[in-house]
Amino acid sequence: MGREKKQEYALLTAWGASFIATLGSLYFSEIMKFEPCVLCWYQRIFMYPFVLWLGIAVAKKDYRIASYSLPIASIGACISLYHYAIQKVAAFSAAGAACGRVPCTGEYINWFGFVTIPFLALIGFITIAVCSFIVIKNK
């Protein structure tokens, strides 16, 4: 497979991940009526613009976006990892008790004993970061 095709598929995959993450986030808050905590809002702030940015980049085949999406997705992943640690690691849970109106330790979902909303966001951010890295490496 050619370099440009790899870049194209990686960029499209990153956009798809951001689109699915945004739809999932909106589903949980608007349909299921799960109120987001403060850290969830920060994750949304980092995730939602990717749908627009990466969508435009896919349409224009502008692979330069990867230079910007990699660090932004990495920051979002760090926030998600911290939020996940607050939920799952006892040493971090004390920090989440006073997170805001909704405690960051709350787990609206807990599929298979480990998949929570911050975990899903973490997977989305990691997918975007890895795809951005692939785009950069194939320049």
Swiss-Prot record:
Subcellular location: Cell membrane
Keywords: Cell membrane, Chaperone, Disulfide bond, Electron transport, Membrane, Oxidoreductase, Redox-active center, Transmembrane, Transmembrane helix, Transport
Coiled-coil stretches: none
Domain of life: Bacteria
A Pfam family it matches: DsbB
Membrane topology: Multi-pass membrane protein
InterPro entries per the UniProt record, alphabetical: DiS_bond_form_DsbB/BdbC, Disulphide_bond_form_BdbC, DsbB-like_sf
Entry similarity comment: Belongs to the DsbB family. BdbC subfamily.
Protein name: Probable disulfide formation protein C
Taxonomic source organism: Bacillus cereus (strain ATCC 14579 / DSM 31 / CCUG 7414 / JCM 2152 / NBRC 15305 / NCIMB 9373 / NCTC 2599 / NRRL B-3711)
